[in-house]
Amino acid sequence: PVLCDKNVVNCDFFDAELVLLPGGMPGASTLEKCGELRNLVLRFAQEQKPIAAICASPMVLGKLGLLKGKKATCYPGFEQYLEGAECTGAPVERDGNIITGKGPGAAMEFALAVVELLQGKEKVQELKEAMCVTDL
């Protein structure tokens, strides 16, 4: 297991470029219940900073109202929590500064979408070549 040595309360996100919510259960529910994390995500949204969530975690964004009118994707069965979103079922969706990923099988495509948002298409191509990724 991965053990955290800090929690969201003990971190300074002032210079953070992006907040990324990992997927899985019960982790996504735990994230959704954390007031400090919800406030951080809302602050990033207000400041128009990038937000990414994969698997079950897009539900956090949905419950905060951040997906209304946006294309989004999530792990099958969690669509009901993406309030007001157009749930596409695609492996990855980027709508503005928000990236959502469907699940574990979309992890590489999701990661490359995050890199593209932060570093651009040239960096994505460089990484794909270095990792021998040819089918994305």
Where on the chain are the PLM-derived regions?
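Extended, subdomain-level signal for the structured scaffold at the beginning of enzyme domains
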Residues: 1-47, 59-63, 68-69, 81-89, ...
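Long, charge-patterned amphipathic alpha-helical coiled-coil/hairpin "stalk" segments used as oligomerization
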Residues: 76-78
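Beta-strand-turn-beta hairpins that frame and shape the catalytic cleft
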Residues: 93-98
